[in-house]
């Protein structure tokens, strides 16, 4: 009987011994806190992956939807997205917003020109200036300077989306290209 109990005890001990070591895993949590009278970066302007051809072409990211359209023989695949910034003022506060009109994306080959940079608005901020901006009063066009907007949310937090046109050169060298877009907000 004692031998039977010893075997039974070993049977219960075996599963505990079969457990492997505890392996930790971690995740990153991130939050952006928007302070009053500021503007902060949220996401980059992305044109996806581009296959160049012997002729030039363009990839346009919409400031309203973040979707891409292509002209010319080049091929674009992958995710496109508009750049996004967030800011905080107060409800009905005016803000003059200006941004880069042209930028160069540099990398291993000839620079690519980013132009027709446009600011798209949404339900958090409304255009309150020149009705001819971007043809319909919802954005800035190349050469526009410090257009006036009104913050319309009760919290004063607003979001700005930025799109533009990337001019891809004929036979553009492969690699990663980057450049900068600067946005300036003057609260009034």
Predicted regions and their residues:
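Acidic, glycine-rich flexible loop segments
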Residues: 120-166
């Amino acid at each position: 009987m004692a031998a039977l109990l010893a075997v039974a005890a070993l049977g219960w001990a075996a599963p505990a011994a079969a457990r492997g070591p505890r392996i930790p895993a971690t995740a990153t949590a991130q939050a952006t806190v928007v302070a009053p009278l500021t503007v902060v970066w949220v996401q980059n302007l992305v044109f996806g992956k581009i296959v160049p051809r012997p002729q030039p072409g363009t990839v346009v990211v919409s400031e309203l939807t973040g979707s891409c359209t292509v002209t010319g023989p080049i091929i674009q695949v992958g995710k496109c997205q508009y750049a996004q910034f967030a800011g905080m003022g107060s409800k009905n506060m005016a803000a003059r917003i200006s941004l880069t009109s042209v930028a160069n994306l540099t990398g291993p080959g000839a620079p690519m020109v980013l132009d027709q940079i446009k600011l798209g608005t949404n339900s958090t901020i409304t255009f309150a200036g020149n009705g001819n901006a971007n043809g319909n009063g919802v954005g800035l066009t190349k050469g526009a300077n410090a257009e006036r907007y009104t913050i319309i949310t009760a919290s004063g937090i607003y979001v700005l989306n930025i799109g533009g046109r990337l001019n891809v050169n004929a036979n553009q060298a492969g690699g990663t290209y980057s450049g900068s877009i600067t946005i300036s907000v003057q609260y009034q």
